């Protein structure tokens, strides 16, 4: 169910989907954080009330740019004008470029309206845009491996709470901020990467059915056939249980108000 960076799907899950355990959804992880940061337009859900089943992996987002753009390093991003593609509000491709532009005053133009990652990659190849920020590293090396392997795409920045072992020499965004309050706010925004591939059921599902869904998810994450297929597709499996995802939301909702306010301002200021 496409639309508005998963907003349509999540609103449906929360308000209209059956509440008997037969309806589950996965969606862009960033959208569930929007109301927590004060962006409530169009949202018809409370993420804390969803029945979280688990997340297949945590994630490292990257800024990936075409080599033809002339942007090859983080230093280049700070000094040379470039265009970045985006999809819907709340999607990583929208949120992370805005935060980067706001924090570091990048000479970046955001080109919104793309219907997903594949469309943005085509736009890059056509030179409509120069790249993407918030691009899932695992997606890049699986779906667009040829572009990266042939050197057509250059990775200039990691967007996560910790570096990926594949990218030891690529800067990590949280290492680039010295101000403690700004760093805390940035980490609040970036924490969505810890639930990179989330699954949830609507509120109101009977507890025993939620427990069954969680057990099935956990069993799948250990299933040899599933893991082998994921490996063939170059998709990482670093699961978080439903309880762990719920704990993350509990931690976020307990964040100090000044940190939440600053995180919201990082996104709002340059929208």
Model feature map: region roles:
Residues 1-11:
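Early extracytoplasmic/lumenal segment of secretory-pathway proteins
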Residues 3-4, 27-32, 204, 270:
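PG/GG-rich flexible active-site loop of Rossmann-like NAD(P)H-dependent oxidoreductases
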Residues 5, 115-116, 241:
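Short loop/turn segments at beta->alpha junctions
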Residues 12-23, 31-127, 173, 177-184, ...:
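Hinge/capping helix and adjacent helix->loop/strand transition within the periplasmic-binding protein
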Residues 26-27, 87, 113, 133-135, ...:
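Short beta-strand and adjacent tight-turn residues that come in two discontinuous sequence segments
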Residues 29-41, 94-103, 131-176:
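A ligand-binding cleft/hinge motif common to bilobed small-molecule-binding domains
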Residues 149-152, 156, 176-178, 205-271:
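An extracytoplasmic/periplasmic, membrane-proximal ligand-sensing/linker region
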């Amino acid at each position: 169910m496409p639309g508005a960076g998963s907003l349509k799907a999540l609103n449906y899950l929360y308000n209209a989907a059956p509440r008997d355990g037969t309806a589950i959804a996965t969606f862009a992880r960033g959208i569930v954080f929007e109301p927590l940061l004060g962006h409530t337009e169009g949202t018809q859900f409370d993420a804390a009330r969803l029945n979280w089943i688990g997340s297949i992996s945590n994630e490292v987002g990257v800024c990936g740019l075409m080599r033809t753009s002339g942007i090859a390093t983080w230093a280049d991003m700070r000094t040379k004008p470039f265009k970045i593609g985006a999809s819907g509000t709340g999607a990583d491709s929208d949120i992370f470029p805005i935060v980067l532009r706001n924090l570091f005053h990048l000479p970046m133009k955001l080109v919104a309206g793309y219907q997903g990652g594949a469309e943005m990659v085509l736009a890059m190849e056509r030179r409509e845009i120069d790249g993407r920020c918030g691009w899932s590293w695992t997606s890049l090396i699986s779906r667009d491996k040829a572009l990266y392997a042939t050197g057509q795409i250059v990775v200039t920045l990691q967007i996560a709470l910790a570096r990926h072992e594949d990218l030891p020499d690529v800067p990590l965004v949280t290492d680039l901020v010295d101000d403690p309050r700004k760093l805390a706010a940035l980490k609040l925004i970036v924490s969505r990467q810890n639930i990179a591939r989330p699954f949830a059921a609507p509120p109101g599902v009977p507890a025993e059915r939620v427990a069954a869904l969680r057990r099935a998810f956990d069993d799948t994450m250990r299933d040899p056939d599933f893991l082998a297929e994921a490996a063939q597709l170059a998709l990482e499996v670093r699961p978080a249980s439903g309880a762990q995802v719920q704990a993350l939301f509990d931690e976020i909702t307990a964040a100090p108000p000044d940190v939440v306010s600053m995180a919201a301002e990082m996104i709002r200021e340059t929208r």
